[in-house]
Amino acid sequence: MNIDVVLLLKQNPILLIFVVLSIGLAIGKIRFGSLQLGNSIGVLITSLIMGHLGFSFNADALTIGFMLFIYCVGIEAGPNFFGIFFRDGKHYLILSLVVLSTAIALTYFCSEYLGLGFGLSAGMMAGALTATPILVGAQDALNSGLAEVPRNMDLGLVIENLSVGYAMAYLVGLISMIMFARLIPKLQKVNLHDSAEQIAQERGLGTSGQRKVYLPIIRAYRVGPELITWTDGKNLRELGIYRQTGCYIERIRRNGILAHPDGDAILQEGDEIALVGFPDSHARLDPSFRNGKEVFDRNLLDLRIVEEEIVVKSDNIAGKRLSDLNLSEYGCFLNRVVRAQIEMPMDLNIVLSKGDVLQVSGEKSRVHGLAEKIGFISIHSQMADLTAFCSFFILGILFGLITMTFGQVSFGLGNAVGLLLSGIMLGFLRANHPTFGYVPQGALNMVKDLGLMFFMVGIGLSAGGKIFEHLTQVGPQVIGIALIVSVLPVFFAYLVGAYALKMNRALLFGAIIGARTCAPAMDIVNDHARSTIPALGYAGTYAIANILMTLAGTFIIIIS
């Protein structure tokens, strides 16, 4: 049996999509030294080649791809979006605005000067900033009629120009941002590690980027004469065992009766006590606890140690420091703090925001008691609330249909902004109501990534047919402008942050990369700083930058 592969792919668009995705994702794993191409570039390269070979793609699939992507971006931003302006919030907003306003101005004037075709400039700007939301916003403005297509062009040609501009500029934007992260600290003679240490001392944060996480363990000891001598008649509160070692007494057996001791309890000879703590905490116990006194008793040691992810919800906790939680009162152990999917530097003086996720371990009832105080335990269900997911998706589309008229001018939000807003609403409500709108993070990541990959396939196949023609005609101009638009806004943001806002350099670099939403560069800065301190800045600008970039895409295509 003979199979015409070309004909098969042309007649089966779904098969074509997944063939392109499979090849592209494999290419994305290729590394050049420490630089990995990444999924977006791999899929983009593959789809460009396939597009050049004459394969095409259904526009409806492209549309649903970008709609799912932008909706999921909103859901992820929702929990932290309204609390982002705590502490350094105005700085993060200013940096995001500097990057985008400078990029828009440079794109507009350079494109006007060189006479780039309509749509090329918006696509180029999206690629130069490696910001798919810009491309989404621009394309949606065209589809919804917010942006007027020139009379000598049709919508298909403009979308093609968008795709070509994005494809030619994307690699330039990615490489330039990675080079910025590598070179600017050296050229400015900035020691990011010292900057991270400085902010850590000011705010009481840990700087270690490589931290091992253990579960607490339980050990039981019999109280003997040596331990009674050591306690000197003090009660448990006065002894401060937790403050000194990190262990706490979870159970005590006296005269055969098991009980949970309070702070007023005084140890007596013959008591058997169960202590919970990390392995190194047990090692810090006074020798009078351990020397020949360990007890192996099933009932005494039968404690259920759990590890839970607690989402911060309480208004009384948001905006306060981690130390205000008084974890020692609950006998709980903090393993890590995650904000906007970024692991934060962890120590007692970090300021908490709504939507932060605290990974806490300890005896089950104690962990649940802590969760009731600060928020709720993240649902460990694999089932998503598809009713809420779909309902808010519909709401976003309805938002996009709203049109406002000012005199002779009509203006609407469009699908991109509408879905972004409804996604933020769902994410925010989910952070405040644990049983509503739950979507497992893995499922959300898959939908977002798959939507983005569908979108990339459509972009590449649309641009591939004319990519070499455009490269020979305007390739040098587009690549040159892309380099300018990629580098100068970041440089201006650095100057503003360093000299006008006087930001700590470790936070500043993280914030600039967050404003560019460029995760690969974030890893490089963390490596330079030998710390996760820059992640504080990244998390600060990331959510607001995603929102502003979608609006910027709509704006740049309207003024082009």
From Swiss-Prot:
It is a multi-pass membrane protein. Coiled coil: none annotated. Residues 203-292, 293-376 form the RCK C-terminal domain. The keyword Transmembrane helix applies. It is found in: Cell membrane. InterPro entries: AAE_transporter, RCK_C, RCK_C_sf, Transp_YbjL_put, YidE_YbjL. Gene3D superfamilies: Regulator of K+ conductance, C-terminal domain. GO terms for biological process: potassium ion transport. The keyword Chaperone does not apply. Keywords: Cell membrane, Membrane, Repeat, Transmembrane, Transmembrane helix, Transport. The chain crosses the membrane at residues 5-25, 37-57, 66-86, 91-111, 155-175, 386-406, 409-429, 450-470, 478-498, 506-526, 539-559. SUPFAM superfamilies: TrkA C-terminal domain-like. Disulfide bonds: none annotated. Belongs to the AAE transporter (TC 2.A.81) family. YbjL subfamily. This is Putative transport protein VS_1837. It comes from Vibrio atlanticus (strain LGP32) (Vibrio splendidus (strain Mel32)).
